[in-house]
Regions:
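Glycosyltransferase-associated regions of secretory-pathway enzymes
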Residues: 1-143, 161-313
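Small-residue hinge/turn detector
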Residues: 144-154
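Active-site acidic Asp-centered loop
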Residues: 154, 159-161
C-alpha cells in the first residue's frame, strides 16, 4: 500500500505542516541519491517520514501522557469485530471470503458491522462524525477510529475485512490485555511502527486507552491525515509520552507483521494446494489480503486466489 508522502499544494492546505513536508521532501527525496538501491532509498524515505511525523505528532502523544489506568476486564470479550461500511452484501468477493474465514475459524463470535449498525455498538464523538460525513476524513481513517472505539467499549479482537483466518485464534491472544504486530519491513511497516489491521485489546486495556486518547486529540484539531499511517504513528507518539504505556508495550510479544503478508503477496497467483495453504498460514495468526489487486479482481484459474474466491464470485 503506497503512502501519501505529501499531498498537492500542501503549503496552502495547512501552514502548520510546512516543516513536516519540508523535512520529508529534503531528507526523503532531494538528499536521497539515485545511486542507492530502490530498497535503500525507500528505507531512507521511510526514516525521514518517521522523524518528521514524530515531531509533528508529539503534541498529540502528550495528550495521552496522564491517562488514568483501569484494571483490564477480560470477561465477555471473546468477540471478533470487523467493519465494511457499505454493508457485507456490497463487499468485494475477497472481503466476503475473508469474513467467511473468520466465522469459520475464529472460535469466537464474529460481529461484522456497517455504517448503519455501527451506532448500535459505539457512540462516536460528534466532531468525528461530522468530519466523516463532510468528506474530510477518508474511509480508512474513519475505520481506524471505529476499531479503537469498539475495543475500548467492548474489548475483543479487531480484524480488517481483508484479513484471512485459517485457524482458531489461540488462547494466549485472548489472555493478553493488548497485542498488535510490529511493523517489520513489508509495505512501509518499518516507519509505521505497528500493524493496525489486527488488534487484540481487553476492555480497559491501558495501551488501547492511551492510543485512543492520542487519536481523538489528533482528529479534534486536524481535518486530514498527515500521512496514511497516522493512526499507527499516533500509537508510537502516545507510548513515547507515557512511561506506563511504554512499560506495558515492552512486555507485549514482539512479533513482526512480515509473516502475515505471505499468502496474498507471494502465493495468490500460484497453483492452489491445500496443504501449502495451511503451511503458509501457520506462522502467523492471520493473512493480510488486498481486494484491489489483479489477483482479486481477475484471478487466474486454479490459483490460490481463484479457489479462495470461487464461492463468493
Amino acid at each position: 500500500m503506497e503512502t501519501e508522502a505529501f499531498p498537492p499544494f500542501f503549503p496552502l492546505m495547512n501552514l502548520r505542516r510546512i516543516p513536516y513536508y519540508a523535512r520529508v521532501v529534503v531528507c526523503g527525496h532531494l538528499c536521497n541519491g539515485l545511486w542507492r538501491s530502490r530498497l535503500e532509498r525507500r528505507r531512507i524515505r521511510g526514516r525521514a517520514i518517521r522523524k518528521a511525523a514524530d515531531a509533528y505528532l508529539r503534541p498529540y502523544g502528550a495528550a495521552a501522557a496522564a491517562v488514568p489506568e483501569d484494571a483490564p476486564d477480560r470477561s465477555g470479550s471473546r468477540r471478533v469485530f470487523s467493519l465494511w461500511l457499505q454493508g457485507e452484501a456490497q463487499a468485494p468477493p475477497l472481503v466476503k471470503a475473508c469474513l467467511a474465514s473468520m466465522r469459520r475459524n475464529a472460535g469466537a463470535e464474529v460481529v461484522v458491522l456497517d455504517e448503519r449498525s455501527l451506532a448500535d455498538w459505539v457512540d462516536l464523538p460528534e466532531g468525528i462524525l461530522r468530519k466523516w460525513k463532510e468528506g474530510r476524513m477518508k474511509p480508512a481513517h474513519f475505520a481506524d477510529i471505529c476499531r479503537l472505539e469498539l475495543l475500548y467499549r467492548h474489548g475483543g479482537v479487531w480484524m480488517d475485512g481483508t484479513d484471512y483466518l485459517d485457524t482458531p485464534l489461540p488462547a494466549w491472544l485472548w489472555e493478553a490485555d493488548f497485542f498488535v504486530y510490529l511493523g517489520g519491513d513489508r509495505l512501509r511497516g518499518a516507519y509505521s511502527g505497528i500493524q493496525n489491521c489486527f488488534i487484540r485489546a481487553a476492555k480497559g486495556s491501558y495501551l488501547l486507552k492511551v492510543w485512543r486518547e492520542a487519536v481523538l486529540a489528533y482528529w479534534e484539531k486536524e481535518d486530514s491525515a498527515v500521512d496514511y499511517f497516522v493512526h499507527q504513528m499516533l500509537f508510537g507518539a502516545a507510548v513515547a509520552a507515557n512511561p506506563r504505556a511504554a512499560a506495558l508495550y515492552a512486555e507485549m510479544p514482539a512479533l513482526v507483521q512480515d509473516p502475515t503478508h505471505v499468502l496474498w503477496y507471494e502465493w495468490a497467483d500460484k497453483p492452489y494446494d491445500e496443504a501449502r495453504l495451511h503451511a503458509i498460514c501457520a506462522p502467523a495468526l492471520f493473512q493480510k489480503t488486498d481486494y484491489k489487486t489483479d489477483a482479486a479482481r481477475s484471478p487466474r484459474p486454479g490459483t490460490f486466489a481463484d479457489i479462495l474466491l470461487a464461492p463468493y464470485r
